[in-house]
Amino acid sequence: AAFPRQARLIRPQLRFHRASDLPVLATSHVYSGAISKELDRDMDDIIFADMPWALKTTTPNQGIREDSLKLSIADNSLQRLLALGVDSYNLISVLKVLEEYPYERFQGETGTLHLNAQRQLQRQLSWAQFKGGLPQALQQVNTRDDGEQP
């Protein structure tokens, strides 16, 4: 796990040590949530998981995200907290469905959500990869809890 400043050093160091072909996976900490094309170019090919809200992928609440950007919130972690609030609000109306149908999924701003056997919400993040200094969402593969394809 590395924050953006440290993560920008990983790829150049791997290239220096002739290990640039190694795949690099990271946590969501690697992406600040702000587009920094020039700074993040050194993170090209790093694969990481993050919430759809941070990756700016198309979601049902696109209007809310656009309105939140008008608030000029300087700290991008507050944007992530806002996404959590949006999901909390939207989940209220579908909790019964998630409880009755264990393989039902809710496509939220924070990821794909479902209720497990213990009635706890679990979240699956979206995968992305830096290309040209920009995070690009990767195609998602849906799996069940037991690892089998649905």
Where are these regions (language model features)?
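Residues in flexible loops and secondary-structure boundaries
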Residues: 54-57, 121, 135, 143
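Short linear motifs at secondary-structure transitions and domain/linker junctions
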Residues: 1-2, 21-25, 100-106
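Short, low-complexity, Pro/Ser/Thr/Gly-rich segments in the mature regions of secreted, periplasmic
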Residues: 134-150
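Extracellular/periplasmic periplasmic-binding protein-like sensory domains
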Residues: 11-86
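Segments of small-molecule ligand-sensing domains
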Residues: 65-137
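Residue-level signal for alpha-helical context at structural boundaries
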Residues: 28, 109-111, 145
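Active-site proximal loops enriched in glycine and acidic residues that flank catalytic Cys/His/Asp
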Residues: 2-3, 26-29, 50, 129-131, ...
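Hydrophobic alpha-helical
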Residues: 1-14
